[in-house]
């Protein structure tokens, strides 16, 4: 039986980490693609030479031509530029929109049956543009944000309660930005909802509010510490969890940026919600009940995403 094929578009920090994790988990053969000549080839060779030590079997290759991704089962997109000091939102949108056009065209030509995971920021707008540019069915194109944001939320909660991260469940709704909505009511420690843990004196509402605030700024906190880039270990691990659920038909319930078609009162926008990921991509959108306060926060988050999408349409009317 042929191995699965995983194409990684962008061979930067996240791309290299994705390749390493995919190899360690033996998810399939791996192609690293980048426009920078030598970079994907060098990283692929370096990782291939680690296989005998780590004991994994996967063929790794690097390429500068989209034909190398032909027949990929999964495509993970990290290509694009990060926001730099002095760069406006529209500057970033304009540059990365062009990248999504080119990546989308490559996927359309060579990997039209793939499950596509977008990591490029601003995430919710870029995954929307990538789906448009690739022409793939919306259930086969998703954005990686909620898994990462939820992981950060879970880590901060486990640190607060001094318990294993395995016993903390939490998820985040909405866009991947300052308006994301970490849901305290639906987050638990060993099955006990956070509001109940406040009642029994394990923590305070003030501490939970501080954790929510830190979760919203989680990416920025790492950027400020690194000074030369942004997070890559946790984003890569998050995307691999999504890819693995698809490839192995695990049907995990994961928060991802998925296209909504009326769910949560949202139409034709990519927004972070819990979904079931299986062999068909997004198998189901899980629509949970929100209270009035949560609805308002979610609505604000959706409005931010809508603003980014409208800006994309203004920059390039072909996306309208």
UniProtKB/Swiss-Prot annotation:
Coiled-coil regions listed: none
Keyword NAD: yes
Residue numbers annotated as active site: 176 (proton acceptor)
Keyword NAD recorded: yes
InterPro entries on file: L-lactate/malate_DH, Lactate/malate_DH_C, Lactate/malate_DH_N, Lactate_DH/Glyco_Ohase_4_C, Malate_DH_type3, NAD(P)-bd_dom_sf
Catalytic class of the enzyme: oxidoreductase
A biological-process GO annotation: tricarboxylic acid cycle
Catalytically driven reaction(s): (S)-malate + NAD(+) = oxaloacetate + NADH + H(+)
Pfam family, one: Ldh_1_C
Binding-site positions, substrate: 83, 89, 121, 152
Keywords per UniProt: NAD, Oxidoreductase, Tricarboxylic acid cycle
Binding residues for NAD(+): 10-15, 34, 96, 119-121
GO molecular function: L-lactate dehydrogenase activity; L-malate dehydrogenase (NAD+) activity
Enzyme Commission number, as recorded: 1.1.1.37
Family the UniProt entry places it in: Belongs to the LDH/MDH superfamily. MDH type 3 family.
Role, per record: Catalyzes the reversible oxidation of malate to oxaloacetate.
Protein's name according to its UniProt entry: Malate dehydrogenase
Organismal lineage: Bacteria, Pseudomonadati, Pseudomonadota, Alphaproteobacteria, Hyphomicrobiales
Gene field: mdh
């Amino acid at each position: 039986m042929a191995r699965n094929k995983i194409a990684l578009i962008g061979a930067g920090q996240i791309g290299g980490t994705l390749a390493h994790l995919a190899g360690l988990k033996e998810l399939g053969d791996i192609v690293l693609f980048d426009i920078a000549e030598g970079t994907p080839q060098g990283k692929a060779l370096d990782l291939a030479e680690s296989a005998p030590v780590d004991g994994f079997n996967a063929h790794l290759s690097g390429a500068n031509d989209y034909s190398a991704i032909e027949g990929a089962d999964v495509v993970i997109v990290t290509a694009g530029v990060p926001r730099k000091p002095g760069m406006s939102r529209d500057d970033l949108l304009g540059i990365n929109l062009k990248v999504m056009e080119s990546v989308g065209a490559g996927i359309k030509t060579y990997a039209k049956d793939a499950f596509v995971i977008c990591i490029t920021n601003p995430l919710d707008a870029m995954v929307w543009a990538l789906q448009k540019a690739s022409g793939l069915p919306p259930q086969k194109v998703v954005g990686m944000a909620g898994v990462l944001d939820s992981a950060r939320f879970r880590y901060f909660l486990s640190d607060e309660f001094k318990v294993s991260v395995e016993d903390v469940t939490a998820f985040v709704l909405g866009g991947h930005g300052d308006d994301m909505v970490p849901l305290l009511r639906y987050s638990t420690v060993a099955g006990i909802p956070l509001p109940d843990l406040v009642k029994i004196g394990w923590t305070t509402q003030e501490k939970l509010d501080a954790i929510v605030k830190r979760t919203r700024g989680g990416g920025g906190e790492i950027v400020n510490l690194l000074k030369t880039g942004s997070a890559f270990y946790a984003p890569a691990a998050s995307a691999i969890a999504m890819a693995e659920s698809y490839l192995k038909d695990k049907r995990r319930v994961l928060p991802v940026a998925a296209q909504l078609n009326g769910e949560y009162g949202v139409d034709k926008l990519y927004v972070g919600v819990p979904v079931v990921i299986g062999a068909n991509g997004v198998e189901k959108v899980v629509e949970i009940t929100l209270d009035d306060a949560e609805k308002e926060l979610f609505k604000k988050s959706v409005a931010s995403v809508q603003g980014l999408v409208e800006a994309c349409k203004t920059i390039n009317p072909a996306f309208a």
